[in-house]
């Protein structure tokens, strides 16, 4: 799963960003559950999901700050 460019993330609508954030939070929860039950084989998925989530949250907060100004 390739990491999206920041420019690609910035082109998404607010609803799409919120949807992707919710999906990634669910994915991270599922990954933690799999790790706790020793079913997780690909531990690099944690890093990928956290980086994608950080990108989305950064763009979301940038938009919130720009509308507040």
UniProtKB/Swiss-Prot annotation:
Task: Report the superkingdom from the record.
Answer: Bacteria
A GO MF label: structural constituent of ribosome
One GO term (biological process): translation
Recorded protein name is: Large ribosomal subunit protein uL29
List the GO cellular component terms.
Answer: cytosolic large ribosomal subunit
| Disulfide feature | none
Please report which protein family the annotation says this sequence is part of: Belongs to the universal ribosomal protein uL29 family.
Q: Which InterPro entries match?
A: Ribosomal_protein_uL29, Ribosomal_uL29, Ribosomal_uL29_sf
**UniProt keyword terms in alphabetical order:** Ribonucleoprotein, Ribosomal protein
Q: Which species is this record about?
A: Synechococcus sp. (strain CC9902)
